[in-house]
Swiss-Prot record:
GO cellular component: host cell cytoplasm
InterPro entries (alphabetical): BTB/POZ_dom, Kelch-typ_b-propeller, Kelch_1, SKP1/BTB/POZ_sf
A matching Pfam family: Kelch_1
Known function: Probable substrate-specific adapter of CUL3-containing E3 ubiquitin-protein ligases which mediate the ubiquitination and subsequent proteasomal degradation of host target proteins.
Protein keywords: Host cytoplasm, Host-virus interaction, Kelch repeat, Modulation of host E3 ubiquitin ligases by virus, Modulation of host ubiquitin pathway by virus, Repeat, Ubl conjugation pathway
Compartment(s): Host cytoplasm
Subunit structure: Interacts (via BTB domain) with host CUL3.
Record's protein name: Kelch repeat and BTB domain-containing protein 2
Positions annotated as Kelch repeat: 295-342, 343-389, 391-454
The organism of origin for this protein: Horsepox virus (HSPV)
Cited PROSITE patterns: BTB
Domain statement: The BTB domain is responsible for the interaction with CUL3 while the Kelch repeat domains supposely serve to recruit the cellular substrates.
GO terms of biological process kind: symbiont-mediated perturbation of host ubiquitin-like protein modification
Stretches assigned to the BTB domain: 20-89
Amino acid sequence: MDIKNDIRNISNLLDDDILCDVIITIGDGEEIKAHKTILAAGSTYFKTMFTTPMIARDLVTRVNLQMFDKDVVKNIVQYLYNRHISSMNVIDVLKCADYLLINDLVTNCESYIKDYINHDIYHKLYEMVHIPIVKYIKRMLISNIPTLITTNAFKKTVFEILFDIISTNDSVYLYREGYKVTILLKWLEYNYITEEQLLCILSCIDIQNLDKKSRLLLYSNKTINMHPSCIQFLLDNKQNRNIIPHQLCLACHDTNYNVCNPCIVVYNINTMEYSVISTIPNHIINYASAIVDNDIIIARGYNFNNPSLNKVYKINIENKIHVELPPIIKNRCRFSLAVIDDTIYAIGGQNGTNVERTIECYTMGDDKWKMLPNMPIALSSYGMCVLDQYIYIIGGRTQHIDYTSVHTVNSIDMEEDTNISNKVMRYDTVNNIWETLPNFWTGTINPGVVSHKDDIYVVCDIKDEKNVKTCIFRYNTNTYNGWELVTTTESRLSALHTILYNNTIMMLHCYESYMLQDTFNVYTREWNHMCHQHSNSYIMYNILPIY
């Protein structure tokens, strides 16, 4: 049986106007003669129409499709005869195919869009609320907002789409309040908005729980200040809680056992008390971790039974529920996770006997990770922090080191630390490029790195001829004047876990059964040392601010 020949014969019926019993009126009053049986075989719309008793009695049926581009209709009718369609605007084809309920053509268009879609047509597809692809497009649009807001397409986004993005309460698409402000203010740069519309948008933002920077940007916006009702709304929703973190998440290893037994501890900074809230799956070490909203993300690492674990877990801090997320593409340990808005970045690290240059990212709600441009050099055990759209990387190891036991995983041996980098670079998450910054004073591994306003602070141990000092360096991201030594103190000779809160750099050390807490105020430049003994013995592996 020659299928190609049969299709050719059917197509000839259309070309020769033989036995036609339907006339389709298209743009400019032009007419296409076709056959009911063939149209009904490929289109549910035509099948339903032609089997309606009143129309079924007609010898010749007329159909009006002047609402669509005439060339698109011609191509789609041709498709129903020979299953082939010429290269055309996929959006126009999709609109018409969806209207005519040609399911296989709609599916083909959806597949094409998923493979080749770009930011310039996101907003056009988003407005096609009646077609199945829209749900996918909405997810793609929202998950790519960090890039989309830098494009011309975002400038043309209509208010209804902006409102849909900011007002969504779907956990897959949910944004932090501060990032909602970023999206809104960027859109306001290019678009007119009525007072009623603006008030409607502001009501979708939790003003009381905004970070200080976002609140200042919102309060100082010229468009918002033009509307009295919007100003009053902001005043009526003053911040009513202290956003300074007072509890931390500590990922620990219980030293009562000779095997890895990691657990998660919530530690209160003010009372220096802690409580175990969960265990970590698979008894892994040298994993990376991060906080996204109220969830702890645990990624990769290894254990001694399986050095190639690729699992990623999300652990809710309140209900303790563990959920497995899509696995990271590259095997990694001794790396870090950076979080910007709802996107997690996994950078470098050690992969077997190799050190990685690769970076990949995952947006909460997606079904997989995706690769991004490589780092300039391969690094593991580096220091990292986030400031605005940038991920800063300081120091790190350039060569592989053997796997170590949990008891020494965080120890620092200054004599054995060779092949250590003094490079400083940052990754621009909007433009997807790496930039090189002034080198650090010396090579360093696992330095504590925090950001404060426009400054990057690095806390690390540096050995001189006599002893080891804990040093704090500062780099201003506006002046680019290089690194300034801010202060030094006697080293505790232990791994440093560093965070910043209330204008204070805090370093936690764990030694035997003691929790050591050192703080340095970036304004007064005063040190404060505290020591607290706890009942059990833990090796603290990582530290993350919760609230």
